[in-house]
UniProtKB/Swiss-Prot annotation:
NAD(+) binds at residues 12-36. It comes from the Bacteria. Keywords: Antibiotic biosynthesis, NAD, Oxidoreductase. It comes from Streptomyces violaceoruber. The gene is gra-orf6. Pathway: Antibiotic biosynthesis; granaticin biosynthesis. GO terms for molecular function: oxidoreductase activity. Substrate binds at S144. One of its GO terms (biological process) is antibiotic biosynthetic process. This is Granaticin polyketide synthase putative ketoacyl reductase 2. The lineage of its organism: Bacteria, Bacillati, Actinomycetota, Actinomycetes, Kitasatosporales.
Amino acid sequence: MATDAPEAPVALVTGSSSGIGQTVAQRLAAEGYRVVVNSARSVEDGEKTAAALPDALYVRADVSEEADARRLVDTAVEHYGRLDVLVNNAGRTRAIPHADLAAATPEVWREILGLNVIGTWQTTVAAMPHLARSGNGSVVNVSSIAGSRPAGSSIPYAVSNGGHRAQTRLLANTVGPAVRVNAVAPGLIETPWTQNSDFFAPIAEHVRQTTPLRRTGRPEDVAEAVLGLVRATYTTGQVLLVDGGAHLL
């Protein structure tokens, strides 16, 4: 378990006002990390999430904007004096059937890649000098199994997750030994967005009927995987599948 404050390590989790990111923030806080909670829009949810955690900080920032990504990292370091873990969870998608090519407009591509790929990159670059000084710096990118198979809520989303994987491995090969870079690639996870979507209902049923573990994932499943990679000091450049065995099909 991480040490107690004021020397406790600091974790920044982007996109952590709800869903997977919120659960990751809560899990890291339970391990003794001081957590920086972030969102671009859901300010009230972000503030409530941070208020429920010990010595947590909420920062509103849109990491798809370079200045905001830098401000987010700078605010975290100014507040705590250090940064040890970065979890790049902020992301977006559109529910677009893969066959509907015309619906995947250039604007959709720019929106999704701008946050999922460029936003992840900008935040990581801003955080890297601080992570390198940590002595145990770790980056975990939250990706998706859509990055490795013809799946996902849209083609632009799947491509963005392929970018996550490449970014993870290239950075791991570049910034070691000072910083480790890994990723988790979840399958279908039960979040308010997926549970309240007609688009995902048949996909969820297919997962429950066909995958080895016969269930969809929970945010807690992803949070445990993230924590495992943060702890795994001899592991870098890995993309950990958290999909109940869907990749075996």
